[in-house]
Structure formats: C-alpha cells, structure tokens
Amino acid sequence: MCELLGMSANVPTDICFSFTGLVQRGGGTGPHKDGWGITFYEGKGCRTFKDPQPSFNSPIAKLVQDYPIKSCSVVAHIRQANRGEVALENTHPFTRELWGRNWTYAHNGQLTGYKSLETGNFRPVGETDSEKAFCWLLHKLTQRYPRTPGNMAAVFKYIASLADELRQKGVFNMLLSDGRYVMAYCSTNLHWITRRAPFGVATLLDQDVEIDFSSQTTPNDVVTVIATQPLTGNETWQKIMPGEWRLFCLGERVV
C-alpha cells in the first residue's frame, strides 16, 4: 500500500519537516520503495518532482528536503507498486488541466474492474489503476460541468460521490487539489492535523528530528497536514473514517 501526504496553508509554507518523515517510509522505515513524487503549487503554476527510485536514498528527494520550496498547497505520494511497473509514468502525483487550473491527484489503494471506466478525452499515460481512475473522475466532471463551475463546494461534493463509486472497486484513499483547495477522501487510512498559534514542538516518528514550529511561523499562520499515518508522535492527529472526506482551503477545514 502506498502513502499519501498533503498540505494546505494560509501562507506559503515549506513542507520539509513532514516530507522528511515521509521519505523515510520510502524504503527506509517502510516498504514503499517503488518511487515517490511531490507537487508544489505556486500561483496558478505548479512544480513536480518525481523519481521511480526509493525516496529514502533518492538524490532528488534530498534536493526537495534541502531546498525549502514554500507553497500553500502540496500533494505528495510514495509508492509500493501493485498495478503497473516501476516507471516514471506510473509515479504519482498526476497533474492534468481542467477549467484552466492544474489538478493534482494521488491515490493509495488497489482497484479491480477499473479497465472498463470511461475516460473520454482524458487518456492515461501509464498503466496504473490510479491514473485511469483520475482520468475517469475528470471525464465525469467535464460531463457534469461543461463550463467552469462557480460553486466549488458543490464540485467537491460531487467528486466525493464519484470517490464513493471507486471505493466499491477496492481501496480508494485520495488526495486531490486544484491549487486552492485540498481534498482528502478516505477508504481505509487517512489522518490530518491543523497547526495554529500557539505553536509547539513536534517530533517525527520515523526519524530523530524535532522542530519548534513557533520559531518557524507567525501567530497568524494556519497549516493543515494530511497523511496516511500520523507523522509525529507527540501531537493529536484526527482520523478520517472510511467513506468520509475532508476539504481544506488556506489551511482551514471547510468540509
């Protein structure tokens, strides 16, 4: 099973601390050795780093850890392959344009019966069930909303109903972002935590690293981190129950 990591913040924030915990699970403290990827949004653009090599000893992962890219929305993934070979085209996250925005998606789980999903003009580049499901989601969205929708809360509610359908085909944990909103849909395991003032000290579970957030933030900062399993041991993470979803915007939970 793969692992997911997402972030939503009200000011551009670096995700180095959480990413450091995640990369250790990519072949170090965890079995997810079949590649990793991370997408940072910046304005309407986004930059993605991917590598089919294990993240815990990937030079590209080290670059991302050492180069604190600040963003308000981040989606990351480490892979334990089940559908599709270990290759760059099968490495999450996947990004496609819809309604003039970059939509980024990462999936944890395994689906059956996915090959019959109709994807319209959206065609997978790789062989994963994950990318096929993403193309299907986008196709369903363009069918329901031929023009750019105004009510994004309703759009994400519709996406959650589509995720319910995919969950019937197996395990479907998902992170999805259009750069402003970050959506988390849970099929088995997904947790989140919102950090705000007064900020304290956090300690990673997977590496002997501690950070005092009060020295890294201002009193107005709000940062939500979403992960498959909690990344820190001395904080209280919220578990999303199977079949439930959360929507975050600028660090705050909106659904």
UniProtKB/Swiss-Prot annotation:
Active site: 2 (for gatase activity)
Keywords linked to the UniProt accession: Glutamine amidotransferase, Transferase
Domain Glutamine amidotransferase type-2: 2-251
The protein's Enzyme Commission number: 2.4.2.-
Leading EC class: transferase
GO MF annotation terms: transferase activity
Cross-referenced InterPro entries: EgtC-like, GATase_2_dom, Ntn_hydrolases_N
PROSITE patterns per UniProt: GATASE_TYPE_2
A Pfam family reported for this protein in Swiss-Prot or TrEMBL: GATase_4
Protein name: Putative glutamine amidotransferase YafJ
Annotated source species: Escherichia coli (strain K12)
Lineage: Bacteria, Pseudomonadati, Pseudomonadota, Gammaproteobacteria, Enterobacterales
